[in-house]
Design a protein with these regions (language model features):
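Residue position within the beta-strands of beta-propeller blades
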Residues: 74-78, 135-136, 176-179, 222-225, ...
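Surface-exposed loop/turn elements that mediate protein-protein interactions on large endomembrane-trafficking
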Residues: 26, 37-59, 83-112, 141-157, ...
Length: 418
């Protein structure tokens, strides 16, 4: 074997350090061995994170239920079918859904109502932190309000296309989240930080691939990267140093579909029709379930990875019916036991799984029904126009019953009129 040339031996240590610090890089292309791993993150000088620097807390924010929870309840918006929407609140103790408004005899249809959102603010995302509610509008604005909806103020105006992308992180003084910014065929992901005292928003890092927040640990955010060539990696991003350490890389992610948490990646493996779990830092995955009734074209929806359980749904053709047959699976990751039924709901005639929207100590708030309702729209001439659309119903279910597939809910009563 030839000895390394003196030039190679004299590579500066600083360059090696940069490569290590940004090790969560895009795998090299198999058809071009000369292409080396390069950081996908845009390297920049670390910015100062202000505040007490407390351990991070993960704030869930799902695509189907873009809301937020506090210790006492859950917030989200509802579409009215008109040029505005309303903020509603589900109170855990009274088990009722109400408008976020305390005014007596309020119609909830005018801007003086604390639940009212005009068309430019409709259907955004929320984050509840301490004694405030933060609303992320689709037009790029961020609004702060009290938990009862009062004292609303606009604290930031950004690019209209910079949409909130699922989970957030919170450290007592700052909010962290991923913004996705489409530009033609390319989408850029930005990890940003908003200081909740001065409302200063800073970009910590930007990526050329799709990035999501999967978990938090101390002062680090676990990021899941998915690249255009369908490879993926997982890294821990220190919010203070703005350095990311790669903890897992998968060059065959195109044949897998799964979820990441703090310690593991649980996924459906299309190559051998199995469910596998890989613990970060270990070499070989653990097979949890074999011989799934599926093929390479079978659509699969991953439901949950939380409380040591992994849940997913297999969709199957249903003859000439437009609705598909759903098979639900839940795996206890501590015992390996599996049940083939999650709690189910009626989605306007089609069965679907009950989605978790809020997590209490011993129970979940779930979307336990989707009904077709009639929306009433008041036109400019005073006439009322009707249209039909979906409306979610909610219920509480014990965690034990949820993971056993027992559909025993306590229904949330609704004071919201459409």
């Amino acid at each position: 074997m030839k000895k390394a040339t003196p030039f190679i031996l004299m590579i500066p240590c600083a360059i090696l350090a940069v490569l290590i610090l940004f090790a969560c890089s895009k795998p090299q292309h198999k058809d071009d061995p000369a292409v080396q791993n390069t950081p996908t993150a845009e390297i920049q000088t670390p910015v100062l994170i202000e505040g007490k620097k407390e351990p991070l807390e993960l704030l869930y924010n799902t695509i189907n239920n873009p809301g937020t929870q506090t210790q006492n309840g859950f917030y989200r918006t509802v579409d009215t079918g008109e040029s505005f929407s309303n903020i509603v609140y589900i109170d855990f103790s009274s088990q009722r859904m109400v408008y976020l408004c305390a005014q007596p005899n309020c119609s909830h249809r005018t801007p003086d109502c604390t639940s009212y959102l005009d068309s430019e603010l409709s259907l955004g995302g929320f984050a509840a932190c301490a004694d405030s509610l933060y609303f992320f509008s689709p037009n790029g604005e961020i609004w702060r309000m009290n938990l009862d909806g009062s004292e609303r103020e606009k604290i930031y105006t950004g690019a209209a296309a910079a949409n909130l992308n699922t989970n957030l992180a919170y450290d007592g003084d700052n909010l962290f989240w991923i913004q996705t910014i489409p530009s033609g065929e390319k989408t850029t992901s930005r990890l940003v930080c908003l200081n909740l005292s001065g409302y200063n928003l800073q970009e910590l890092c930007s990526f050329d691939e799709t990035v999501s927040i999967a978990a938090v640990q101390d002062r680090s955010i676990v990021l899941q990267h998915r690249f255009a060539d369908e490879t993926m990696s997982v890294g821990k991003f220190d919010v203070d140093t703005q350095q990311e350490t790669c903890i897992y890389t998968d060059e065959t992610a195109s044949a897998k579909y799964g979820l990441v948490d703090l310690t593991r990646y649980v996924y459906i493996d299309y190559t051998d029709k199995s469910v596998k779990e890989i613990i970060f830092g270990e070499q070989n995955p653990i097979t949890l379930l074999e011989n799934l009734d599926m093929n390479e074209n079978t659509p699969i929806y991953v439901n949950e990875l939380r409380d040591d359980h992994f849940a997913f749904t297999i969709h199957r053709p249903n003859g000439d019916n437009s609705y598909m047959i759903h098979d639900y699976y839940s795996i206890d990751l501590t015992t390996g036991n599996m049940v083939n039924q999650l709690p189910v709901i009626d989605n306007m005639g089609e069965e679907t799984s009950a989605e978790i929207v809020a997590d209490m100590q011993d129970a979940y708030l779930v979307r336990c029904g989707i009904q077709r309702v009639t929306y009433h729209t008041v036109m400019d001439d005073g006439t009322i126009q009707q249209r039909e659309g979906p409306f979610a119903q909610y219920g509480m279910i014990s965690k034990e019953n949820y993971w056993k597939g027992i559909s025993e809910y306590t229904a949330i009563q609704s004071d919201v009129n459409l």
